[in-house]
Amino acid sequence: MDMLNLTLKPGCLSLNQLRQVSRSPINLSLDASAIPAIEDSTQVVERVIAEDRTVYGINTGFGLLANTRIAPEDLETLQRSIVLSHAAGIGEFMADETVRLMMVLKINSLSRGYSGIRLNVIQMLIDLVNAQVYPCVPQKGSVGASGDLAPLAHMSTVLLGEGQARHNGKIISGLEALKIAGLEPITLAPKEGLALLNGTQASTAFALEGLFIAEDLFASATVCGAMSVEAALGSRRPFDPRIHRVRGHRSQMDSAMAYRHLLDTSSEIGQSHSNCEKVQDPYSLRCQPQVMGACLQQIRNSAEILLVESNSVSDNPLVFAEDDDIISGGNFHAEPVAMAADNLALAIAEIGSLSERRMALLIDSALSKLPPFLVDNGGVNSGFMIAQVTSAALASENKTLAHPASVDSLPTSANQEDHVSMATFAARRLREMGENTRGILAVEYLSAAQGLDFRAPHKSSPRIEQAKQMLREKVSFYDKDRYFAPDIEKANSLLKLAVHNVLMPEALLPSVL
C-alpha cells in the first residue's frame, strides 16, 4: 500500500482515509484554512489569563480539585503536572498503528479551534506522525470519561521529552524521539495539557480498528459462506431478491445481493443439482442474508457513529472564540463510542458463530453428502475433525467477550466523575474478537475449498473459483492427514490481508471504496 499523503481539513476525515491511516504510515499536513480558528482560540485563553478570570482547566485544578485556584506563576507547572501525573496506564503497549490513528484523531480534534491550544503544539504531533515516531501508550487504564486520560497523557509525555516512544520497532526515550523528529521539548501553556488529555481519541482509535476488522470479516464470511453453499450443494433460492424485499431491511437485501453476486448462474456445481428433491437447507446456509444482513446493519450503524466521533471536538472545557466564551461540558464522555463498539462486538461474534456452524455442516456427511470430516479413507484419516473443535473454542470465547461493556460504570475522582463509559475496553477487545473470528473463518475457508474440490470436475462461479484459487496457491488439497496448524495460519494470513474485499459488490461496506 502506498503511503497516504493527507492534507487535513479539520472535521472532514472520511472513513476510507481513517482506514488507510490505520493500515500504513502517512505523510500528514494541516490545511492552512485551519490556522485562524486555532489562533483565535488561543487568544481567548490568553485574555482569560490577562484579565485574571477564573476558568476551569486554565487556572484551576482538575476533577474534584476544580474549585482550587492556581497562582499565575504555577500555571505552566500545572499543565506539565497533569500530563505526568495522568500517565498512569498499565499493560502492553498499543500497536503503532493504533497510536498513529489516535494521534491523527487528536490532531483533527485540536485543529478545529475549540481547544485553546497553540499551532506549534499541534504541529509537533504532526511531525511525530510523519517521522513514524509513536509514543509508547499502555493499553489499559482508561474508563472512557473524562476522556481517555491515561492513554492521551502517555502520548503527550513525549512532547515534554519524557516517557518513551517506538521508532522502527525500537523503544527509545521521549527525548530521543523528539530528536528523530527534529523537535525540542515544549513548555505547555495554560489549557494545553488538559486539551491534549481530554478526548475520546484512544477509544475511538480502537473502535475504528474494530470497525475495519469487522468489515473485512464480513466480506470474507460472505465469500466463505457462498463457498460453503456450493460445497454442500445448497440452494440458491434463499437469496432470491423477492424474499428479502418483502421483509424490507436494506442491509439484508444488500447481503442477499452479495451472495447472488458471488453465486452467479454460471456455476456448474449449481446447475448439477438444480432439480434435486431437497426442499430446504439448514439455517446456517439458508438464513445467511438474514444473519449477515443484521451484522451489516450493526457495522453500518457503528460506522456512522464513529465517523462523527472521529471528526468531533471532545475536549473540555471548550473555547468559543466568536463569543469570547469558555464552557465546561461533557463531550469527553465516550458513551457513543462504547455503544458502537458493543454493537460491533455482537456483529463480530455472530459472523464467527455462523461460520463455525457452516463448517460443522460440511464435515457432517449426512448433511453435506461429502466424505466424513472432508477426507477420504476416514478412520485412518481424521481430516477436519479437530479443526472444527478449534472453531468451536474460538466461537465460545467470543460469546463471552461480546458481553456489553457500556452497561458497566465505576465512579472515579472521588465521585466527581460518577458515571463513565468503559469505551476503551469496549473497543479494545474488538481486536481479540476479530482474531478469533478470523481463525474460525480460516477453518471454514479450508473446509469449503476442500468440499469444492470433492465436487470436481464441476466448477463453481468465477468469483468462487477465484477465492478457492487464492487459497490453493498457499494450501494444497488434503488427500491424507498432515500437520494442520500451518495451513490454518496460511489461510488466516490471507484473510488478514482482506483478499476477499475485491470479490464483493462495490459500496457495500462503509470504509471500503
Swiss-Prot record:
Pfam families: Lyase_aromatic. There is a cross-link at residues 145-147 (5-imidazolinone (Ala-Gly)). Disulfide bonds: none annotated. It catalyses: L-histidine = trans-urocanate + NH4(+). One of its GO terms (biological process) is L-histidine catabolic process to glutamate and formate. GO terms for molecular function: histidine ammonia-lyase activity. InterPro entries: Aromatic_Lyase (IPR001106), Fumarase/histidase_N (IPR024083), HutH (IPR005921), L-Aspartase-like (IPR008948), Phe/His_NH3-lyase_AS (IPR022313). Contains an active site 4-methylidene-imidazol-5-one (MIO), which is formed autocatalytically by cyclization and dehydration of residues Ala-Ser-Gly. Its main location: cytoplasm. Keywords: Cytoplasm, Histidine metabolism, Lyase. Pathway: Amino-acid degradation; L-histidine degradation into L-glutamate; N-formimidoyl-L-glutamate from L-histidine: step 1/3. It comes from the Bacteria. It is found in: Cytoplasm. GO terms for cellular component: cytoplasm. Its EC number is 4.3.1.3. The modification 2,3-didehydroalanine (Ser) is found at residue 146. Belongs to the PAL/histidase family. This is Histidine ammonia-lyase. It comes from Vibrio vulnificus (strain YJ016). The lineage of its organism: Bacteria, Pseudomonadati, Pseudomonadota, Gammaproteobacteria, Vibrionales.
